[in-house]
C-alpha cells in the first residue's frame, strides 16, 4: 500500500533507513532537497501505523502524524534486496536497489 509506494518512489542510495519511533523502530525514507533533508517516517503509535514528514534530525511528533492504518504490529526487515513491511493486515514486500543502516 502507501508505505511500499513511498519506499519505491524514493529508492536511491541512502534513501531507506531504520530510525527509532516512540514505540519501537521506524522505517525512514530520506529525501534530500535544496531546502534541506527531509524524512518520511513510518512507525507505530497508539494502535496505529502513522506517517510523519519532518526535517531530518528533528524529534518525532506523533501528534502531527497521519494515520496509515490501524495496527498493533509494525515491523520490517531487509534481505537480499527485498524490504518486507508487516502490519496486522499482513506483509508487503518491495524490491529495492539500495538500503542503508543494515535494517
Language model segments and positions:
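Type IV pilin-like appendage domain
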Residues: 23-84
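Short linear sequence signals and composition-biased patches located at protein termini or domain-edge surfaces
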Residues: 78-103
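Functionally constrained cores in energy, signaling, and assembly domains
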Residues: 7, 18, 72, 87
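Residue-identity detector for glutamine
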Residues: 18-20, 51, 89, 100
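Membrane-proximal N-terminal amphipathic helix
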Residues: 1-17
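Short, charge- and proline-biased low-complexity linear segments
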Residues: 15-25
Amino acid at each position: 500500500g502507501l508505505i511500499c509506494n513511498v519506499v519505491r518512489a524514493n529508492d536511491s542510495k541512502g534513501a531507506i533507513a531504520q530510525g527509532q519511533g516512540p514505540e519501537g523502530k521506524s522505517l525512514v525514507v530520506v529525501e534530500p532537497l535544496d531546502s534541506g533533508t527531509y524524512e518520511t517516517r513510518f512507525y507505530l503509535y497508539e494502535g496505529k501505523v502513522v506517517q510523519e514528514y519532518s526535517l531530518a534530525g528533528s524529534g518525532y511528533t506523533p501528534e502531527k502524524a497521519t494515520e496509515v492504518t490501524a495496527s498493533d504490529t509494525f515491523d520490517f526487515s531487509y534481505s537480499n534486496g527485498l524490504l518486507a513491511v508487516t502490519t496486522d493486515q499482513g506483509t508487503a514486500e518491495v524490491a529495492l536497489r539500495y538500503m542503508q543502516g543494515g535494517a
